[in-house]
């Protein structure tokens, strides 16, 4: 008998930030993560690893692009080919990097403009309104 690893995502979106969640199913586990508890998602090949505010991690076999399409735009933003961040936790933005807690994340050129819009960066807003 063949044993195949499968993963399933179940979403429940609330009307406001903090009320939605994602349920991640692995081969032998299921874990519900509230959107408000997810700091970032890190992609590595065919896998995505969720990093929670309590320091826990959950890895599932979905590419980061699938996760980008699955997570709500009003909470999460892709900043690099390997990272999706909960933008509510971004502390610092310097040059081509952003910081959440003690960790710095690179910001790719393809994602910079959207990040500046989401963060309401004043200089970027003035340039885009011309």
Identify what each model region corresponds to.
Residues 120-130:
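Short, charged, intrinsically disordered terminal tails
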Residues 2-100, 104:
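Conserved binding/recognition cores within well-folded domains
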Residues 68, 116-117:
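A cross-family signal for key residues in well-ordered alpha-helices
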């Amino acid at each position: 008998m063949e044993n195949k690893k499968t993963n399933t995502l179940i979403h429940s979106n609330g009307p406001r930030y903090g009320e939605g969640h994602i349920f991640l199913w692995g081969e032998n586990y299921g874990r519900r993560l509230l959107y408000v508890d997810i700091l970032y998602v890190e992609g590595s090949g065919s896998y995505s690893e969720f990093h929670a505010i309590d320091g826990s991690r959950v890895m599932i076999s979905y590419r980061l692009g699938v996760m980008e399409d699955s997570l709500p735009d009003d909470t999460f933003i892709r900043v690099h080919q390997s990272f999706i961040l909960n933008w509510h936790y971004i502390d610092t933005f310097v040059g081509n990097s952003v910081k959440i807690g003690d960790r710095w994340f690179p910001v790719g050129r393809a994602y910079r403009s959207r990040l500046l819009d989401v963060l309401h960066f004043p200089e970027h807003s003035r340039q885009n309104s011309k």
